[in-house]
Amino acid sequence: TANEVFTNSVTEIFAAKNANVDYYKVQNDLTTASLIDNTYIDQKDGSVVSVHTFSFGGKLTRNNLNFYQNGERIDSTMKGVTIIEEKQHVDHHTLVHHIQPNCESHQDYKGIYGENATGVFNGKIIVDKIAQKTNAFQQNNNILVSDKATINTKPQLEIFADDVKCSHGCTIGQLDEEALFYLQSRGIPKKEARALLMYAFAN
């Protein structure tokens, strides 16, 4: 329709030796807007890069986030919070490629999905054979606040080195009914109690 909007964006970040970069993305579009966001990050020795993605709106959002560790003593951090409802769809695809030894990466994505919302998390960590002493962490936690909401999560590890520390995991659940009851028993209305629990989870 005439009100539909489609955006295809590309961001490239080149972190030189010992550089420190913090990059924040806030996605809060109209329900008629679709976005494909492509972010590519190339890191050199000793660089530290953090990307924080907040996805709150839009009809369809696809985030492609790719880190390439082209050096040693590199630290890469990806954090994301998704809060959507209605028929919104947010799709996170992450890749961290550990190419050199003695590097770290941290991924922590959280999602809260309401009525008819759909979420996807597809995260991959690749550790090359030469990338010994790698420390890589990946976690995706989700709450479905409606029985019509869905989440598809797929954390992945491809490890070709033998001296590494790598972990990944995911959780899918609902709001804690006992915690909700406790807050209501202290005089907090149900709507506000639910909001407090979701805030605590996302925080």
Predicted segment positions?
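Conserved beta-strand/loop scaffold segments within soluble protein domains that form the structured core
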Residues: 1-181, 185-188, 202
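Short, surface-exposed loop/turn segments at secondary-structure boundaries that line and modulate
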Residues: 197-203
